[in-house]
Regions:
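NAD(P)H-binding glycine-rich loop region in Rossmannoid oxidoreductase-like domains
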Residues: 10-12, 16-62, 72-74, 78
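NAD(P)-dependent short-chain dehydrogenase/reductase
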Residues: 94-100, 129-175
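Short, solvent-exposed loop/turn and secondary-structure capping segments
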Residues: 51-55, 89-93, 150-151
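Active-site segment of SDR-like NAD(P)-dependent oxidoreductases
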Residues: 46-48, 84-91, 143-146
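Short, conserved catalytic or adaptor-binding loops enriched in Gly and charged residues
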Residues: 2-13, 129-132
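Conserved Rossmann-fold NAD(P)-dependent oxidoreductase catalytic core, especially the SDR/UDP-sugar
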Residues: 58, 62-115, 136-138
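Conserved catalytic Lys-bearing alpha helix of Rossmann-like short-chain dehydrogenase/reductases
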Residues: 61-67, 119-127, 166
């Protein structure tokens, strides 16, 4: 395991089922209709902040729409893992200090500056829209993931993480 010491073996196969697949393939997603589950937790995503192709939108937005369709058809719940980054960089170039972003806030004038944030924003928009039509769904916005304090180990795709690149830039400028 890359990030954790515990493998959680005791819950796999009884309470938690990991399904490997391609959420960008609607036909493959639809094969899950026959799998017995009550809640689908989608943590599949491309977390690159930069991409030269349409992979971020295909995975993070269109893939989520395929999962929404599956959950709507089968009347199952969806938990979508998203990011606090959808808050964008600013509210009209200045975030008021008293502004609190609530769970049901999506667009409030913020600036969306990269493909990753846009793709996650559009995915949330699709989940919110589907929930107004009856989909039982929750969105969990994960904060900025950082390296482990114990050994400094960070995610595999360090070079495409916008926040870490920004920190590296600050460090380089300071030198």
């Amino acid at each position: 395991m890359y990030y954790f010491d515990d493998t959680f073996d005791e819950v796999f196969g009884t309470r938690l089922f990991l399904i490997e697949g391609d959420i960008t393939d609607a036909d493959q997603v639809n094969t899950l209709s026959n799998v017995p589950f009550s809640v689908l937790i989608n943590c599949a995503a491309s977390v690159k902040h930069f991409a030269a192709d349409d992979s971020l939108k295909r995975i993070n937005t269109e893939g989520v729409k395929h999962l929404i369709n599956l959950c709507e058809k089968t009347r199952r719940k969806l938990i979508q893992i998203s990011t606090v980054s959808i808050a964008g960089d600013s509210l009209n170039n200045s975030i008021p200090s008293d502004r609190k972003i609530m769970e049901n806030d999506l667009y409030f004038g913020q600036t969306i500056t990269n493909q990753y944030i846009e793709s996650k924003f559009l995915a949330e928009q699709a989940v919110f829209e589907a929930s107004t039509k009856g989909l039982r769904a929750k969105i969990m916005r994960v904060g900025n993931l950082m390296s482990r304090a114990a050994d400094g180990e960070f995610q595999i795709n360090f070079i495409t993480n916008g926040f870490m690149r920004q920190l590296k830039g600050y460090a380089t400028l300071h030198q």
